[in-house]
Amino acid sequence: MIPGTETIRNVIADLRIAASFVTLLPVGSSKPAADGAIARATWALPVAGLLVGLAGALVYKISSRLGLTPNLAALLALATTALITGALHEDGLADTADGLGGGRTRERKLEIMRDSRIGTYGVCALILSFGLRWSALAAIANPWLVTLALCAAHCAARAGVPAFMSLVPPARPDGLSASAGAPPGRSVAIAFAVGTLVLTLALGPGKALVGLILLSLAGLILARLAIRQIGGQTGDILGAFEQTGEIVILLVAAAFQMGR
């Protein structure tokens, strides 16, 4: 066997696993049953996010070239990223808002989060999520800066997921998050490094630092809420974390875009 072949195969396998779990891209990998495979592959989540961001940026660029306004181009870019991911993270955000906002007991909150129907809290959360991201992209306007912002947001938002999974215990023993297991330290470190690198290259050191601080604070608040109300994290909580990350990074990019 050629030296390094097994390592390359593992990297490719992890990339396919990550992409298959957070996108609808035809990567040729079904959800794996091997123990520890999902947790190990979490390092590749920011890489999968980078691909999603690039797809949204491409649509924004094409829309701008066709003469569409920044508002319409931003809307199409968001629609593209939602289609590629199957609105997986948006669904998690809505379920989290409904569960944490609507249930009185831990059991009822978890029951609501598993319900496929969407409630008032979920609708409001989705409106705010799409509205804030749409407004941020439209404010940035410049196609090149939008590309950098989308890549940074989708990459960094997923880069924190392994750490969140590692630090916050599963809320129930039978959920997807519990079955995946806690990511090993190596996966957490690689994901963080990839996310930080992309964020820094895309937005610059200053804005990247602001984004990391705000994203960490948002993650701590969400973790505290999840532990207090339902005893830990679920797949829906992870989706809400990703959406929060996108919003934070895009708002940072929009707020400081004039300073580039």
From Swiss-Prot:
GO cellular component: plasma membrane
UniProt keyword annotations, A-Z: Cell inner membrane, Cell membrane, Cobalamin biosynthesis, Magnesium, Membrane, Transferase, Transmembrane, Transmembrane helix
Reactions the enzyme catalyzes: alpha-ribazole + adenosylcob(III)inamide-GDP = adenosylcob(III)alamin + GMP + H(+); alpha-ribazole 5'-phosphate + adenosylcob(III)inamide-GDP = adenosylcob(III)alamin 5'-phosphate + GMP + H(+)
Keyword Membrane attached: yes
UniProt topology in membrane: Multi-pass membrane protein
One Gene Ontology biological process: cobalamin biosynthetic process
This protein's pathway: Cofactor biosynthesis; adenosylcobalamin biosynthesis; adenosylcobalamin from cob(II)yrinate a,c-diamide: step 7/7
Superkingdom per UniProt: Bacteria
Subcellular locations according to the entry: Cell inner membrane
InterPro entries: CobS
Transmembrane segments: 42-62, 68-88, 118-137, 144-166, 180-200, 201-221, 237-257
Cofactors, names only: Mg(2+)
Listed EC numbers: 2.7.8.26
Main location: membrane
Enzyme kind, highest EC tier: transferase
Entry's Gene Ontology molecular function annotations: adenosylcobinamide-GDP ribazoletransferase activity; cobalamin 5'-phosphate synthase activity
Presence of the UniProt keyword Transferase in the record: yes
Pfam family, one: CobS
Family affiliation: Belongs to the CobS family.
HAMAP family hit by this protein: CobS
The protein's role, per its UniProt record: Joins adenosylcobinamide-GDP and alpha-ribazole to generate adenosylcobalamin (Ado-cobalamin). Also synthesizes adenosylcobalamin 5'-phosphate from adenosylcobinamide-GDP and alpha-ribazole 5'-phosphate.
Protein's name according to its UniProt entry: Adenosylcobinamide-GDP ribazoletransferase
Lineage: Bacteria, Pseudomonadati, Pseudomonadota, Alphaproteobacteria, Hyphomicrobiales
Protein encoded by which gene: cobS
